[in-house]
Amino acid sequence: MQRSRRALLVRRRVSETTSNGRNRFYKVSLSLVFLIWGLVFLSTLWISHVDGDKGRSLVDSVEKGEPDDERADETAESVDATSLESTSVHSNPGLSSDVDIAAAGESKGSETILKQLEVDNTIVIVGNVTESKDNVPMKQSEINNNTVPGNDTETTGSKLDQLSRAVPLGLDEFKSRASNSRDKSLSGQVTGVIHRMEPGGKEYNYAAASKGAKVLSSNKEAKGASSIICRDKDKYLRNPCSTEGKFVVIELSEETLVNTIKIANFEHYSSNLKDFEILGTLVYPTDTWVHLGNFTALNMKHEQNFTFADPKWVRYLKLNLLSHYGSEFYCTLSLLEVYGVDAVERMLEDLISIQDKNILKLQEGDTEQKEKKTMQAKESFESDEDKSKQKEKEQEASPENAVVKDEVSLEKRKLPDPVEEIKHQPGSRMPGDTVLKILMQKIRSLDVSLSVLESYLEERSLKYGMIFKEMDLEASKREKEVETMRLEVEGMKEREENTKKEAMEMRKWRMRVETELEKAENEKEKVKERLEQVLERLEWMEKKGVVVFTICVGFGTIAVVAVVFGMGIVRAEKQGGLAWLLLLISSTFVMFILSL
C-alpha cells in the first residue's frame, strides 16, 4: 500500500512539473508573438509614411513641371522625359534582377534586329558582301593553322604569304567605312523610341477604346474591366483584394512596339495597386506569353508611367495584379494607357533620319565644292584642266563621291521631297502616295549603291584574279611535288614487294633446311642403331673368343699332360703320339691367333 501511494505521489509531482513547463513555454511564446506583431506594425507605419512623402514630392514636381499651352509643341518632349524619369518606378530588386538576366539574350537580339532595320539598305548590302568575303580568308587562315607543321620557318612564311594575298587592304578600309557610317546613322535612333503623336499634339494611346482597343478577358471576380480603357474617373475595375489570380487581357488597336504604360487609381475608398506584371503576345489565345516586365507602383492617387527596358512588338497585353496597398475590401484600377510606335511610324522615322543624313552630306559637298572653286580661281588654266581631269578620275573611282554626285544631281532636278513637307507636321500621318514616293526615292538610292557595289566588285575581281593565278601556280607546284611523292611511294611499294618475295624465298629455304635436318637426324638414329648392333656383336665375339681360348687352353693342357706321360708308356705306338702332338700344335696356334 505504501509503495502504491509513493508511486501516485511521484506521478503527481511529474505531471505538475510538466504542466508548469508547458505554461511557461506558452507564456514566453505569446510574449514573443506580441513583440513581433508590434515590430511589424511599426515597420508598416514607417513604410507608409515614407511612401506618402515620396508621393507628395512627386506631385509637387509634376505640378511644377507642367508646360504652358503656348510652348506645347517645343517643350512637350522635355516635360514627358522629366515626368517619365520622376514618376517611373523601378521594379523590385529581386524581380528586376531575374527579369534582366532572363531577358539579356533577347534584348541583345532585338537591339541587333532594330539596328539592321534602321540602317540604310545600301550599307546593309555592302556589309553583307564584305562579310561574305571576309569569311573566305578567315577560313583559309584556319585551314592553314590546322595543317601539320614541317619546318617552322617555312610554315610561318607560307602563312604570312597566304594572309597577305587573301586579305587586300581596300576591303578592310571599306568595311571600316561602312561600320562607321552605320554607327553614325544609328547614334540618334537606337537611343530611345519616339512615341506616336495625335494631330492635337498628345501621345497616341493604343489601349483606348476610341482607337479600337478591347478588353478580351479577366478573372471571374472582376467587374468593370472595360472601364480601364475609357478615360472616365467615375468608372474603374473592381476586384476583391482577397481573390488570387487577378488579371486583365487587352487587345491593342494595332500591332505596336510598346515602350511605356500608364496606370492610375482615382478611387479614394479602395486599395491601390502595388506590384503588377506585364505580358505580351502577337497571337491570342495563346499559351506562351512574352514577359515584358515586373513593376511596383507608388501608393498614390495619380497617374504613373512605367517604361520597359526592352520594348517588344505585341498586339495583346496581359496585366497580372500581384499585390496591393492597405487593407480595404476592394482593389480598384481606373486607367491603363499604352504608348509606343507602330510599324509604319517606325519605318517613316527611319526614312526621315536617312533623309536628314543625305541633306547633311549634300551641304558638306557644297561647301567642299565652293572651297575648291576658290582655290581653282587662283591657279592657272592649265593646272585647272589637269586637276579637273584628276578629280573626275577620283570621283569615278571613289564610291562615296559617286553617291554624292548622284545626290547633287537629284537636288538639281529639284524633285519634291514629301518627307520634308510632312516632317513639319508632327502629329500628322503620311498618306499612301507620299509613302510610295519615299519608296521610289529609296529604290533610286539602292540603284546608286548597286552601281557602287559593281565598281567595287570589279576591282576586287581583278585583285582576286591575280591572287587566284598565283594560287594556281602554287597548286601546280604542289601537284608536281605530289607526283614526286607518288613516284616515291610506288618505289617504296616495289621495294616492299621485293622484300616480301625474298622473305618467301627465305621461308622456303628454311623449310628445305628443316627437312634435310630431319633426314639427317633419322640417319643419325639409324647409325646409332647399327653401332649398337655392332657393339653387341663385338661383345658377343669377345665372349666367344674367351670361351674358345679357355677351351683351347684346356685342351692344350690335356695334350701336354698326355704327351708328357704318354711318351714313356706308349713308345711303341707311334701313331697315338702324333695325334696328341697335332692337337697340341692346333690349340697353341689358336691361342696365338686369339691373343693377337
UniProtKB/Swiss-Prot annotation:
Ranges for the SUN domain?
Answer: 179-343
Q: Which domain of life does this protein belong to? A: Eukaryota
Could you list the residue ranges forming a coiled coil in this record?
475-544
User: What is this entry's stated membrane topology?
Assistant: Multi-pass membrane protein
PROSITE patterns in the record: SUN (PS51469)
Name the major location: nucleus
Q: Which GO terms describe its cellular component?
A: endoplasmic reticulum; endoplasmic reticulum membrane; nuclear envelope; nuclear membrane
Q: Keyword annotations for this protein?
A: Coiled coil, Endoplasmic reticulum, Membrane, Nucleus, Transmembrane, Transmembrane helix
Which purpose does this protein serve, as stated in its record?
Encodes a member of the mid-SUN subfamily of SUN-domain proteins that is localized to both the nuclear envelope and the ER. It is involved in early seed development and nuclear morphology. [TAIR].
Known partners and oligomeric status: Forms homomers and heteromers with SUN3. Interacts with SUN1, SUN2 and TIK.
What is the protein named?
A: SUN domain-containing protein 4
Supply the source organism's classification. Answer: Eukaryota, Viridiplantae, Streptophyta, Embryophyta, Tracheophyta
